[in-house]
Amino acid sequence: MAGTVLGVGAGVFILALLWVAVLLLCVLLSRASGAARFSVIFLFFGAVIITSVLLLFPRAGEFPAPEVEVKIVDDFFIGRYVLLAFLSAIFLGGLFLVLIHYVLEPIYAKPLHSY
């Protein structure tokens, strides 16, 4: 089923986004004073109308079209392993240089105190 996330289509996410936005606006407008407070009613009924229109007039058919089996081919197989070999060589070379720097770090003699 194309265009689905977690087994549901885009319409469910549109309705969820609509109702989250409406409830957030209702909470914000309920704290307002004057005539703006009563706009919550119109906002709620507008969301009900939009939801009913989206539910009563679906775009897709009731039965989904049969899916065509897609054959997955890895076109970048060789390039991926060349890149892996190149990055592994860079990593090992860097590790070698760090260890050489660690082993060959000079140790300076501490000065003797002369009394």
Swiss-Prot record:
Keywords: Cell projection, Ciliopathy, Disease variant, Joubert syndrome, Membrane, Transmembrane, Transmembrane helix. The keyword Magnesium does not apply. The chain crosses the membrane at residues 5-25, 38-58, 81-101. It is a multi-pass membrane protein. Belongs to the TMEM218 family. Interacts with TMEM67. May be involved in ciliary biogenesis or function. It is linked to TMEM218 mutations result in ciliary dysfunction leading to a broad spectrum of disorders, collectively termed ciliopathies. Overlapping clinical features include retinal degeneration, renal cystic disease, skeletal abnormalities, fibrosis of various organ, and a complex range of anatomical and functional defects of the central and peripheral nervous system. The ciliopathy range of diseases includes Meckel-Gruber syndrome, Bardet-Biedl syndrome, Joubert syndrome, and nephronophtisis among others. This is Transmembrane protein 218.
